[in-house]
Amino acid sequence: LNLDEFALLAPQAPGGTWYPYSFIAPDSNNEPAFSNSIEIINKVVQDLFDKGLRSDQIYFIGFSQGACLSLEYASQNAKKYGGVIAFTGGLIGEKLNPAKYKGDFLGTPVFIGSSLKDMHVPLSRIEASAELIKNLGAEVKTLFFADTQHTIRQEEIDWVNKNMLK
C-alpha cells in the first residue's frame, strides 16, 4: 500500500484475536471481547481527535477480523473519514441490525475486496454490509475474485493505491 505519507497506528488484538468466534456467530458468543475491541479502536480515534486530527484524515484498514472491526467501528460512528479499506470483511453480528449504525459517511470511500467463496466471510454478508454502508452515505467499491483464498490480492492493493491512497 502507498502509505509513505501516512502515520500508521496498528492496535493489536488482545491475545491475537479481536473476538473469539466467527464475526457472524451469535452476538453474545463474542462478548465481552467484541465490545472491548470496539472500545480499543474508539480510544485510538479519540486520541487522534484530541491531537487535532480531523475525521477526514483518518483511514481504517484491516484484513479479516481487522477488516470486520474497521467496517463495524466506522459504521457505528459514521462521519467523513479519509477512507475504510476492508480486505475480506463485513459488518459484525449474527444478523445485521441497521439500528446500531448511525451518522453519515458524507461520501467516505469504502473498499471491500474478497473471494467469491471465502471460507470465513460469506459473499451474502459482504453484499449486505456494502448496501447498509451505502445507505449511511459512503461511496462503496467491492471487488470479488473467483478464487477461494482468504488473502489480500495484489489487484486489491493496486485498486486501493490508485483510487484511495493517492
Question: What do these predicted ranges mean?
Answer:
Residues 111, 127-166:
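C-terminal catalytic histidine-bearing segment of alpha/beta-hydrolase fold enzymes
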Residues 20-26, 89-109:
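Flexible "cap/lid" loop of the alpha/beta hydrolase fold
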Residues 12-16, 90, 148:
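Short beta-to-alpha linker loops that shape the active-site pocket of alpha/beta-hydrolase fold enzymes
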Residues 1-57:
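Serine-hydrolase catalytic machinery in alpha/beta-hydrolase-like enzymes
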Residues 111-114, 118:
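Short beta-strand/loop motif that positions the catalytic acidic residue
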Residues 61-66, 70:
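Gly/Ala-rich beta-loop-alpha elbow adjacent to hydrolase catalytic centers
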Residues 72-83:
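Conserved hydrolase catalytic core segment
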